[in-house]
Amino acid sequence: DVKDFRINSGYMEVMLSDGITAYQDIGSKDSKVIVLVHGATLGSLAYEEYVNVFLENNYRVITYDQYGRGYSDRVVNDVNIELMERQLQELIEYCQAENVILYGVSFGAAVVAKYASNNPDNISFIGYQVPLIDSANVPLLSLIKIPFYGDLLSRVLFIPTALKRIKDYEHLMSKKLMDHYLDQFKVKGTEKFFKEFFIGNAMGNRMDNHDVIGNNDIPSYFAYAEDDLEIDSLLVKQAIEKYNNPTVKKYLGGHFFSSGIEKQVAQDFIDSIEKY
């Protein structure tokens, strides 16, 4: 049960419209605030190195687990991008954060793009790392959407694939993080959440959101790898073109290029903020 899973997590909890959100709000309330949004499977615990760098640079930092992941509730109805945006919006309001700096990783970049396009006046800077722009060309997701077959496929293929995927990076992860990642899949409701997550619109096309953000001249930062096999780098380049003079950092190493160099990547983001 998720209640048992989050015992002794060290996270704070708040009941939002759709369930309990586990979050951390660290640093001086008088400092500029960075809200960091994790990706589709790795929860916020994966970004402790980023948080430390942000704090060392005197920023306030808010991180949280999106519904269905980490220590937050397993929401299994109406799992869509609007749910994830609503969670982010309500948490920002609850924490009384204004003129926020957003940093989204992978699917988290889709969430911050959705939020920023609807709340441009509350964003002072936005950063994307390996941003998901559109997952329409991912064959596995198309198969999962097939009735009945999709249920079986998500159980016998997706979950094992997600577990194997992260084990390739086990040597770069702490035992604490690896155990947390594996254990979250044992929490009741996680499997059903992911099935609903992938058949809905959560991973749909966000290019229109980038259009709006770019038109509002919000200062921006992109970090991605051209050899990323999970994110279409051509779509990332198209999104970048929507922005006015964004900071762009290219790396090698695929979707998880930041593994082992988290401090460098986090500091690169801070340096890009402080140029403005």
Residue map of PLM features:
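Conserved alpha/beta-hydrolase catalytic His-Asp/Glu region
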Residues: N137-P139, V156-G214
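Gly/Ala-rich beta-loop-alpha elbow adjacent to hydrolase catalytic centers
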Residues: G104-V112
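Flexible "cap/lid" loop of the alpha/beta hydrolase fold
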Residues: S117, I123-L153
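Conserved HGGG/HGGXW glycine-rich cap/lid loop of the alpha/beta-hydrolase fold
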Residues: I26-Y71
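Active-site loop/oxyanion-hole signature of alpha/beta-hydrolase fold enzymes
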Residues: Q66-Y103
